[in-house]
């Protein structure tokens, strides 16, 4: 985890190892001085700075050698090593469009990365009808991506610069989940002929799994796994069930925590616990409707959630099974205690520090 001491809330920040590198010997990035100790409800954390100088970092992944791959929304793929941020960026990326909230967004390593060296990237890209989310993969060879190929293009594209979604998560079967926002055009999230406002599931090679819920339905895009999602920017697999849990941004209020299941409609914009910006007026039909899922948990006022992971390590047994996510709005680390499919407690940590949390990864041992 990283504290950003200067510049804007989202500039030059990066989440790093294990809830703030609580022990120096548990990680390979041990060249940085301890910055401060922070008390929480269940223990004291040590915060370290891992890297500075990043430009809107958005996604990250740990390489087998302990280095960290980091995406910068402005279009660069960087490496953080034992001496901090490496000067040169990785070359060979696909063509990326930086506009509004769009740019180079998330990344994930192939489950067989040790053998095939595939890195998957989500990003905004231009098309004949506008811009939209795409996913490509390339083989990492030293400081370059080789054999880059586009595996998925969100269709149709749009003209705005909002709500690209873009989290990437592999499940145990090697299928890739891609979260997509509604692109600022609310009705699109309820359409099966439109990728916007949905969660996508494809194979690692970009094919449609045979058991996807809308495969074979006339007019539906077979890649769609769920619909009615406003803008999912945090997703993680439950360590016991293997199901995909996610959170998404609401409008003014109504950020949600959900379990993403096949064929489920999560309601946006027909139902929501949020209201319209500025006017505070109701959106859609209220908060409930038959055939549309209720969130497991929601936030009013919004916290602007970002990044998400379940803690599964041994170093902090009191947190095992808890969800951690960042709050962009309040500049906090949020911890959720889970009982089955219920949130039973919430703790806000690292309050009022000059940093926003754009991504969160917890790791208690070196890769």
What are these regions (language model features)?
Residues 32-186, 234-250, 301-339, 345:
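Acidic, Gly/Ser/Thr-rich repeat motifs that build Ca2+-stabilized beta-propeller blades
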Residues 344-357:
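Conserved blade-ending motifs and adjacent loop-strand segments that build the rim/top face
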Residues 134-142, 194-204:
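Beta-propeller blade signature
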């Amino acid at each position: 985890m990283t504290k950003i001491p200067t510049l804007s809330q989202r500039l030059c920040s990066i989440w790093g190892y294990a809830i703030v590198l609580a022990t120096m010997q548990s990680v390979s990035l041990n060249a940085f001085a301890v910055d401060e100790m922070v008390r929480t409800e269940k223990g004291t954390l040590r915060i370290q700075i891992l890297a500075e100088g990043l430009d809107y970092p958005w996604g990250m992944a740990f390489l087998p050698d302990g280095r960290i791959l980091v995406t910068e929304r402005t279009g660069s793929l960087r490496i953080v090593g034992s001496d901090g941020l490496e000067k040169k960026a990785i070359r060979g990326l696909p063509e990326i469009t930086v506009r509004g909230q769009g740019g180079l967004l998330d990344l994930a390593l192939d489950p067989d990365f040790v053998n095939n060296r595939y890195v998957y990237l989500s990003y905004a890209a231009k098309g004949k009808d506008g811009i939209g989310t795409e996913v490509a993969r390339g083989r990492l060879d030293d400081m370059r991506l080789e054999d880059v190929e586009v595996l998925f293009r969100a269709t149709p594209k749009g003209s705005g610069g909002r709500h690209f979604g873009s989290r990437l998560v592999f499940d145990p079967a090697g299928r890739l989940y891609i979260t997509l926002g509604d692109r600022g055009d609310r009705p699109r999230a309820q359409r099966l002929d439109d990728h916007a406002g949905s969660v996508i599931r494809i194979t690692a090679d970009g094919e449609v799994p045979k058991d996807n819920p809308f495969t074979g339905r006339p007019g539906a895009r077979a890649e769609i796994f769920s619909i009615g999602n406003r803008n999912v920017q945090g997703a993680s697999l439950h360590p016991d069930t293997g199901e995909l849990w996610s959170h998404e941004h609401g409008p003014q209020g109504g950020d949600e925590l959900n379990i993403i299941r096949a064929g489920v409609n999560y309601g946006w914009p027909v139902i929501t616990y949020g209201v319209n910006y500025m006017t505070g007026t109701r959106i859609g039909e209220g908060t409930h409707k038959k055939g549309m899922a209720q969130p497991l948990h929601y936030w009013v006022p919004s916290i602007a959630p970002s990044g998400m992971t379940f803690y599964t390590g041994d170093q902090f047994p009191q947190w095992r099974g808890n969800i951690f996510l960042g709050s962009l709005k309040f500049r906090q680390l949020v911890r959720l205690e889970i009982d089955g499919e219920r949130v039973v407690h919430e703790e806000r940590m690292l309050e009022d520090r000059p940093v926003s949390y754009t991504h969160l990864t917890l790791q208690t041992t070196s890769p």
